[in-house]
């Protein structure tokens, strides 16, 4: 039986929600939210990323979108309450961006 081993990084300088494998970073009056490399490792192949629309109000731990994987669809839980001010359209167009650079170009949403 083969065994998959996680070989990712968990950068300093971010805040983490270990229960939902999400990270956030303060950027002025906004926060940037994304999935951790470990959370994406657990999800496997990401086929689609679908965030809620800009302007949506999201309570802490409630869903702000979904990722569709090879075998399931997973809800993405907000680590803080926020109103979505931007969604990563590049990651929507090419969900592999989330896996390639989860802490940079693979951010998911911004909010206030």
Question: Could you tell me what each predicted segment is?
Answer:
Residues 58, 64-65, 84:
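Generic structural signal for buried aliphatic residues
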